[in-house]
Regions:
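...captures the hydrophobic TM-helix bundle architecture rather than a specific catalytic motif
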Residues: 1-205
Length: 205
């Protein structure tokens, strides 16, 4: 049992009664993720609403999506939630090499997701002529999926920076707050994709 008022290794403080007070970094990340959840919720509602107005105008969702490609890319992203969790646990166990391995795999899976998204867009634009200005479907689809891809890209960049810092031993088991908040962000990005995938590729078709 830790003494009251002692700082923990996660960037919080154990206050009297053992309540955890989050660090400013964690509070900031939670606030950011809350605002991003509202942002994506608005985009998803806009996609569903406008899609109902434009389903008869070609090209439309029932024609253009290639589910095998989308499923493969999605599997990579969903798997990355597991690998980043394992990486964080490895760092807490002071297993730096295991952390680097699992964290690096998470980056690769994120890149594979982006590759799959790029190939899907190539198909939509090249074969079907679907662009963000083509019709309401194109506008709402590329806005929603594009912003998600942007968030994945940002996540991959930040994780790559963390990987470099960890290799140079600037991130260790005694300093896991940065890794933890990046993990929160990545789990959020994965969670958003579950909802986006459901509405765009399942319900929307």
């Amino acid at each position: 049992m830790a003494p009251a008022g002692r700082s923990d290794s996660d960037g919080g403080t154990l206050s009297p009664g053992h309540l955890v007070t989050l660090s400013p970094v964690k509070v900031g990340m939670l606030t950011f993720l809350g605002s991003e959840a509202a942002f994506f919720g608005t985009l998803i509602m806009a996609y569903v609403y406008f899609l109902r107005q434009t389903t008869q105008e070609e090209p439309n969702p029932s024609q253009v999506f290639r589910l095998p490609m989308i499923l493969a890319a999605s599997a990579c992203l969903f798997s990355s939630s597991a690998t980043i969790h394992v990486a964080e646990k490895a760092l807490r166990r002071k297993s730096q090499e295991a952390f680097l391995g699992w964290w690096g795999l998470t980056i690769v899976l994120g890149l594979l997701f982006l590759l799959g998204t790029g190939l899907e867009w190539k198909n939509l634009i090249g074969r079907w002529g679907l662009t963000i200005s083509r019709n309401l479907f194109g506008t709402t689809y590329f806005t929603l999926v594009g912003f998600h891809a942007l968030h994945v890209t940002i996540g991959v960049i930040v994780m790559s920076i963390v990987f470099g810092l960890a290799r140079s031993r600037q991130i260790t088991a005694g300093n896991v707050t940065g890794v933890e908040v990046v993990s929160w962000y990545w789990h959020f990005v994965d969670g958003v994709w579950v909802v986006v995938f459901t509405f765009v590729y399942v319900v929307g078709r």
